[in-house]
């Protein structure tokens, strides 16, 4: 029996230190709720988890971007709803003015024309005033530019967490000039061109086919209505796409969060079981260390 080195006590002390260290790690994981609190806990798992976290946050921001895109489209579409209503009223007035058999050109047609002029001015007003976060939406800033594609401006929405996951939207000029109601210089053009509506020029001849006649001007209004309808349909399609995009982003984010949780989050029941085991082993080690420290004293029995 040796008394200078208590090997049993040293071995027991090592076990006690190991059990205490394991218990501390168990408590850290239980208190944080995370299985990986530092790279040393699981280096590969930490790297994968951080990549997933980046993707999750990217998906969340992409969903917000899509929501903002829907808000922009709703702003533009709401303005075009009013433009549609104005054009329907203009068409109604043109049809009314076409009843030249009962209209007086000097008074009745001029009154109708005054209202038409006011309405077309408001179409321009809507086009110039409709904005979203400082961006004018309906004045042609973001229209398709086939003449100079290099100068094309698009409304770009980042709808994914990674590069090249964007959609571009164009909105045509919805001003009165572009809708075929009037030209910038106010001139009367050919039937296929943009026209100024001027019902005071309607002739009494029902067979009139001139560019300033009833048929020509009514066709201009109908074309304007069709242009607005087409633009609203395109915006509606983009809005529907963005709504589906949001649903997909939500599902992807949910699945990725669940996967990241399985890597990084702690299994509370399992970890509590491990903590209980290590705590019991620590207490047992303390008791055995006390016993090991008593062994050298037994040498005194040999000296009696």
Swiss-Prot record:
Chief location bin: secreted
GO cellular component terms listed in the entry, alphabetical order: bacterial-type flagellum; extracellular region
Alphabetized UniProt keyword annotations: Bacterial flagellum, Cell wall, Secreted
Induction text: Under positive control of SigD. Repressed by CsrA; repression is greater in the 1A96 than 168 genetic background and higher in minimal than rich medium.
Gene3D superfamilies membership: f41 fragment of flagellin, N-terminal domain
Subcellular location: Secreted; Bacterial flagellum; Secreted, Cell wall
Effect of residue 255 to A: Peptide of residues 247-265 no longer binds FliW
Residue ranges crossing the lipid bilayer per the database entry: none
Functional description taken from the UniProt entry: Flagellin is the subunit which polymerizes to form the filaments of bacterial flagella. Assembly into flagella requires FliW. Acts as a homeostatic autoinhibitory regulator to control its own cytoplasmic levels. Partner switching by flagellin between FliW and CsrA provides a flagellar assembly checkpoint to tightly control the timing of flagellin synthesis. Flagellin binds to assembly factor FliW, freeing translation regulator CsrA to repress translation of the flagellin mRNA.
Assembly with partners or alone: Interacts with FliW in a 1:1 complex. Forms a 3-way complex of Hag, FliS and FliW, in which Flis and FliW do not directly interact.
Listed name of the protein: Flagellin
Organismal lineage: Bacteria, Bacillati, Bacillota, Bacilli, Bacillales
């Amino acid at each position: 029996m040796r008394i200078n080195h208590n090997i049993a006590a040293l071995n027991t002390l090592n076990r006690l230190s190991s059990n205490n260290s394991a218990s501390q790690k168990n408590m850290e994981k239980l208190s944080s709720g995370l299985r990986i609190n530092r790279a040393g806990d699981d280096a590969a798992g930490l790297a994968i988890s951080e990549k997933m976290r980046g993707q999750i946050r990217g998906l969340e921001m992409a969903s917000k971007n899509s929501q903002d895109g829907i808000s922009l489209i709703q702003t533009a579409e709401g303005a075009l709803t009013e433009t549609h209503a104005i054009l329907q009223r203009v068409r109604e007035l043109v049809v009314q003015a076409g009843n030249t058999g009962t209209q007086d050109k000097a008074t009745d047609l001029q009154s109708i024309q005054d209202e038409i002029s006011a309405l077309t001015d408001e179409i321009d007003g809507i086009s110039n005033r409709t904005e979203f976060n400082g961006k004018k939406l309906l004045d042609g800033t973001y229209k398709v530019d086939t003449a100079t594609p290099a100068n094309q401006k698009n409304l770009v929405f980042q709808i994914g967490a990674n590069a090249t996951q964007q959609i571009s939207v164009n909105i045509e000029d919805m001003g009165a000039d572009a809708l075929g109601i009037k030209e910038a210089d106010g001139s009367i053009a050919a039937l296929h061109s943009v026209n100024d509506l001027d019902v005071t020029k309607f002739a009494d001849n029902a067979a009139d086919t001139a560019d300033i006649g009833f048929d020509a001007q009514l066709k201009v209004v109908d074309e304007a209505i069709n242009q607005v309808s087409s633009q609203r349909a395109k915006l509606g399609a983009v809005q529907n796409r963005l709504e589906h995009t949001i649903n997909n982003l939500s599902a992807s984010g949910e699945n990725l969060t669940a996967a990241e949780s399985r890597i990084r989050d702690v299994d509370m029941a399992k970890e509590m079981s491990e903590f209980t085991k290590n705590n019991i082993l620590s207490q047992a080690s303390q008791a055995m260390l006390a016993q090991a420290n008593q062994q050298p004293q037994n040498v005194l029995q040999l000296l009696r």
